[in-house]
Amino acid sequence: MKKYSLFLLCLMAAISLHAQSFADYFADKTLRVDYIFTGNAAKQEICLDGLSCLPSWAGRKHHLSELPLQGNGQIIMRDAANGSVIYKTSFSSLFQEWLETDEAKAVTKGFENTFLLPYPLRPAEIEITLLDPRRNVRASMKHTVSPDDILIHQKGTAHITPHKYLLQSGNTAKCIDVAILAEGYTPEEMPVFYEDAAIACESLFAHEPFRSMKKHFNIVAVASPSEDSGVSVPRLGEWKRTAFSSHFSTFYSDRYLTTSRVKSIHDALAGIPYEHIIILANTEEYGGGGIYNSYTLTTAHHSMFRPVVVHEFGHSFGGLADEYFYDNDVMTDTYPLDVEPWEQNISTRIDFISKWEDMLAQGTPVPTPSSESGTYPVGVYEGAGYSAKGIYRPADNCRMRTNEYPTFCPVCQRAICRVIEFYTE
């Protein structure tokens, strides 16, 4: 009887914790936290760079202490008084990608990173952790935020960047809010930017499951102006003065288009409800990049703009991995072959039951030969995550593998659907 009573007590406590509402812990505002991730391949550190308050909260108000995906890093917010977990989020970062390059073995660098958290009603402890490819802790730090701290910068009440909604399905509290920003567009070119943003929006919702779940999204185009037209192309010696200082040749890969000026992105969005970010670069050069829960950045005037913006959003929103691979790829060793990746669309088969094993038709050969892709639309095809051997993808082709294939594969569709449901249901 005593054991039963103890079990009942624990169960009730767990249910009570799960049922606590957003309003018990948070105001309807956003705590923006800026960090600097710094270090090299041997040692990494996390530094707090600043705190800001934004006038509203556009993120989820349920599943507060759960994660949709593990990511390459995590933030846990706890009530400082009793230590209970009141919010979690996960992410990846350009810094962690850089740590796997040869340059990181020789020099120390710092990278900006910004995260949006619900604004606590009472003092809260924030713990941020960076993980390595083997899921070991690389760096971690804790700090306490007091909501009445006078040095928390108030932003988003004035000087708001001009913007217009391309899709407004409902209240920001219930919908997923995606902001599309201009990069390399002068004030005179903003009509072109709005046209490009509309194409990006149209392209996204031409794909399942975004098409059938369109009602869950708000899309806002934000006219962030640049001094120069175009973006920087280092291999051509071209350096432009743009809103977010983006450039190609990230990590000396010609087509990898990114920015390390993350704070400027969020400054441009202050006062506009947003959760996820797409940045359009005013250039005909081919390239792009997508970082989970950070941003998508893609060229807007290359012929492959439409498929690339969707592919990169698959990274930044859906947490999907690249399914392509090349012989002698410099990123071949990105994923250890004895560790199951957290991304839902690739597998080392170490923990395949957690991936798409349940979606395989009876009798599907494992591995699945590419020659039988017509028979097995969902299989276990070798070659993914930049490696030709030891990593598997769920379909012979997919939007996450090539620009030419018109759709996400069934496994990627399910993964994206689950993320949308996590944020909205």
Task: Give a label for each model feature.
Residues 4-13:
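Sec-dependent N-terminal signal peptides
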Residues 313-329:
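Catalytic Zn2+-binding segment of zinc metalloproteases
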Residues 15-19:
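Sec/Tat signal peptide C-region and signal peptidase I cleavage site
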Residues 190-193, 288-312:
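Short pre-active-site segment immediately N-terminal to the catalytic Zn-binding motif
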Residues 150-211, 221-231:
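Fold-level signature of zinc-dependent metallopeptidase catalytic domains
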